[in-house]
Amino acid sequence: MSRKCEICGKGPSFGNNVSHANNKTRTTWYPNLQKVKAVRNGSVQTIKVCTRCIRSGHVTKAI
């Protein structure tokens, strides 16, 4: 299971946590993915979508 949005392709980003003492430790930030039942190609499928795509209306939710 990949941590990637199936609509826009947004995935994890990498960087450093930096303390006040300027110590750096590697970290990973993951997108806010939700499992949504959506209509794709005329059928209902469960897909993982980021909240940005849900809010902007790129996903047609199944009722």
UniProtKB/Swiss-Prot annotation:
The record's family statement is:
Belongs to the bacterial ribosomal protein bL28 family.
What name does this protein carry? Large ribosomal subunit protein bL28
UniProtKB keywords:
Ribonucleoprotein, Ribosomal protein
Superkingdom, taxonomy of origin: Bacteria
Q: Gene of origin?
A: rpmB
* Organism from which the protein derives: Geobacter metallireducens (strain ATCC 53774 / DSM 7210 / GS-15)
Q: GO biological process: what's one of them?
A: translation
Which GO molecular function, any one, fits this protein according to its record? Answer: structural constituent of ribosome
- Please name the InterPro entries in this protein's record: Bacterial_rp_bL28, Ribosomal_bL28, Ribosomal_bL28/bL31-like_sf, Ribosomal_bL28_bact-type, Ribosomal_bL28_sf
The record ties this protein, via Pfam families, to:
Ribosomal_L28 (PF00830)
GO cellular component terms, alphabetically, are: ribonucleoprotein complex; ribosome
- What is the disulfide pattern of this chain? none
